[in-house]
């Protein structure tokens, strides 16, 4: 098919409606282009539970093999399980998933050997160009005289063992945990990873179903964790965990059913990773995580490094600084011991170890890491984003004790509060995050900024 790749190839991945925007013929071209751009002689491929995933990943495999690459198929897996395979086997990888997007969508997340990201500046632009040319009839390079082999391999047990070796769970007290897999890949990975741990596991929506019959598999949207919150309370559970569709993100709910801020989880895991590393090391966090994160990092002997929002920035900084851990307020958690890739499962194991290693409830445990009042991210439709950012800067430039920085959008910081305004890359939106030392101040700053934006 001749496709509009401008709508299909995003900043970090490929994503679109099947078969309207892409199909198996295009997937085969992506496989060939991936091998050509990465110069790979072998690759690994995994896929999620979407109805179209097996056929699309199979077509990608054929395209790669035709270019002479040996293909290892690991079948059904979470995205972080694919990253594990890419790291452990030292092979470029492709994961077929559209995370929490509706059933008619599918996509490809690609990485180089060692789970190094493939984004626009690291190969995706070249892959897109080749696929565009070939889909429009340009001749492809001749097929390899010796096509690659296609073999299957199960990596789930090895993936689980790798994660469990990174967190000491031997001495934890028994815990009751409700896990909402959202009919996504958490239903595939959680039983194997949690097997043998002193956990009373209450599974919620573990049946793999790419039509998402119960709720969207996006735990950052409050309406999607309502069932989990209710079940935690009904079961008297110690905590709840919610995974997104491809199970690379994990959201935590405490024993009262209250969502735990991903910034608090970032701070908690950072403290534990620093302790594992002898009380030293660099931790990367994006600029909309809480003030709590750099504070906790410094208190535990580490060096915080602040970066832009977006996983490619975190992974780049992780590599540059040799960081031990990185966290985003979107519930992505990155680990040096996991090839700088993100794994919500490893973050979940850290939470279980921290909670099970003491007697108090999770709400008390995370209170030490959740020190400020946050607004969450608030979107406003704005036609001229640049003009709006300039107006906001002008409005605050005459005030005392104000600093500005432009690392990502505009961050305005005062003694007792800060806010960040970022323009969306894809929509006419400004995204606002506010944090303050107390709820009253946060609300006042939030309302003032929103009034200026929406005037």
Predicted features by range, described:
Residues 1-62, 66-68, 92, 149-175:
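An N-terminal, well-structured beta->alpha segment
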Residues 41-48, 72, 176-178, 281-287, ...:
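Short glycine-rich phosphate-binding loop at a beta-alpha junction
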Residues 43-106, 164-165, 192-253:
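N-terminal small/polar loop signature for handling phosphorylated ligands or for N-terminal nucleophile
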Residues 46-47, 179-181, 214, 254, ...:
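Short glycine-centered, acidic/aromatic-flanked micro-motifs in structured strand/loop junctions
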Residues 104-129, 253-269, 339-349, 355:
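A short, gly/pro- and small-residue-rich
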Residues 106-235:
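Gly/Ser/Thr-enriched, mixed-charge loops and adjacent short helices
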Residues 125-160, 255-329, 333-335:
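Proline/glycine-rich low-complexity loops and linkers
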Residues 239, 279-455:
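Phosphate-binding and adjacent anionic-ligand microenvironments
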């Amino acid at each position: 098919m001749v496709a509009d790749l401008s709508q299909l190839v995003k900043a970090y991945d490929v994503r679109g409606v099947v078969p309207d925007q892409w199909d198996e013929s295009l997937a085969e071209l992506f496989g060939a282009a991936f091998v050509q751009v990465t110069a790979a002689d072998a690759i690994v491929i995994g896929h999620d539970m979407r109805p179209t995933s097996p056929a699309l990943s199979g077509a990608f495999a054929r395209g790669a093999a035709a270019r002479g690459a040996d293909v290892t198929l690991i079948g059904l897996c979470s995205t972080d399980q694919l990253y594990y395979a890419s790291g452990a086997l030292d092979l470029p990888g492709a994961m077929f998933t559209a995370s929490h997007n509706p059933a008619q969508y599918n996509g490809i997340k690609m990485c180089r050997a060692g789970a190094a990201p493939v984004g626009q500046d690291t190969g995706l632009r070249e892959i897109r160009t080749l696929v565009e040319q070939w889909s429009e009839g340009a001749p492809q390079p001749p097929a390899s005289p010796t096509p690659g082999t296609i073999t299957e391999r199960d990596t789930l047990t090895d993936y689980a063992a790798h994660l469990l070796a990174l967190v000491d769970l031997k001495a934890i007290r028994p815990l009751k945990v409700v896990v909402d897999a959202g009919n996504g890949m958490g239903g595939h990975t959680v039983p194997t990873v949690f097997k043998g741990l002193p956990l009373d596991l209450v599974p919620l929506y573990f049946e793999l179903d790419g039509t998402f019959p119960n709720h969207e598999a996006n735990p950052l949207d409050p309406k999607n964790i309502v069932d989990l919150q209710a079940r935690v309370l009904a079961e008297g559970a110690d905590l709840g965990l919610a995974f997104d569709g491809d199970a690379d993100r994990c959201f935590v709910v405490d024993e009262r059913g209250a969502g735990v801020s991903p910034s608090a989880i970032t701070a908690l895991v950072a403290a534990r990773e620093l302790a594992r590393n002898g009380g030293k090391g660099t931790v990367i966090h994006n600029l909309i995580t809480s003030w709590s994160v750099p504070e906790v990092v410094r208190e535990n002997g580490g060096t915080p490094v602040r970066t832009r929002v977006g996983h490619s920035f975190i992974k780049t900084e992780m590599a540059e600084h040799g960081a031990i851990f990185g966290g985003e307020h979107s519930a992505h958690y990155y680990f040096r011991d996991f090839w700088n890739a993100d794994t919500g499962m490893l973050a979940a194991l850290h939470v279980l170890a921290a909670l099970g290693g003491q007697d108090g409830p999770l709400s008390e445990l995370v209170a030490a890491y959740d020190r400020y009042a946050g607004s969450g991210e608030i979107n406003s439709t704005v036609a001229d984003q640049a003009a709006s950012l300039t107006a906001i800067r002008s409005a605050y430039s005459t005030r005392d004790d104000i600093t500005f920085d432009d690392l990502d959008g505009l961050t305005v910081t005062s003694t007792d509060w800060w806010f960040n305004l970022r323009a969306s890359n894809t929509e006419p939106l400004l995204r606002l995050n506010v944090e303050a030392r107390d709820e009253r101040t946060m609300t006042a700053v939030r309302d003032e900024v929103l009034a200026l934006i929406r005037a």
